[in-house]
């Protein structure tokens, strides 16, 4: 038996090609009209929570004079959200390389406000012809159980219901507004636009791309449990649903607690989240020493999601019949996976793998 197939069969994953009534999904229309909306709503209800109502923000921009030795324009873009309860402003930074017509844009949800940042090698990114649109996740809403402040405070009613938005959903909400803004910019209207994030923000990037089909690609770096990694069959040393929910319940909908001791009861697994991105491009990055992020289950999720790309006549995920090893970079399909040496980090190496794979996939080189 195939090595990979054997590993997948052990996990007894819900079948993406079979709907809730037991009918086979054999066409793109059956997927887009029935199964995709069903899974999307299920994942929001049971895992991340429903996104809050749309608010059109007031936007203001200002130019930063220091601009990478003249190689880029650098703007501060502020999003001011107001509703009947309150108002809140989120600062972001947009860096666009000069002289690059229709360059790809990457929305990056970051752990800090500064650019460059240890996770954003900005000059290397613009030298590769990519624009970067960055936001500090704590400037959206704080990474804790406080739902009274930040964007969350505009919607918090005093209690969280079963499908109330967790912090990951709020971070995704902001990223979707950043996409709205880029679509109004002349420099980005005809450009590829992707989203990237690391760890909990890699989870956020995947959710954002799953919900908003305007994203052309998504880079999920070391996103692990409740991101790119399957929840069933958690590998030795990997983070389980119990581990993540008992430490970070505020990331998720309260409904998610039902499954933390029995992930096999989940009516979906994370390959379904990846499948919601089809037929667009997904790039999953893992690090060998980052066992907590469960590299094998991130790899297997890529394999398990691939049949949905095949429905579209796409390549999906292409790899040899083996589990991944250090140095592997499978980027011949629409789903890409690489495993580097090192620890839990968004490195320059990861950025370069993602950028080169995007260039290859979209024939930019």
Question: Model features per residue range: what roles?
Answer:
Residues 278-293, 340-341:
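Conserved strand-to-loop "acid loop" that flanks and positions the catalytic carboxylate
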Residues 101, 107-185, 224-227, 231-232:
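Cap/lid segment of the alpha/beta-hydrolase catalytic domain
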Residues 86-90, 96-105, 128:
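Proline/glycine-enriched tight loop/beta-turn segments at coil->beta junctions
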Residues 115, 119, 176-238, 262:
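Primarily recognizes the serine-hydrolase "nucleophile elbow" in alpha/beta-hydrolase
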Residues 247, 257, 302-365:
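C-terminal catalytic histidine-bearing segment of alpha/beta-hydrolase fold enzymes
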Residues 220-273, 298-320:
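Mobile cap/lid helix-loop segments that gate and shape the active-site cleft of serine hydrolases
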Residues 291-301, 347:
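Conserved alpha/beta-hydrolase "acid-adjacent" motif
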Residues 1-89, 359-364:
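N-terminal targeting or regulatory segments adjacent to alpha/beta-hydrolase or S9 domains
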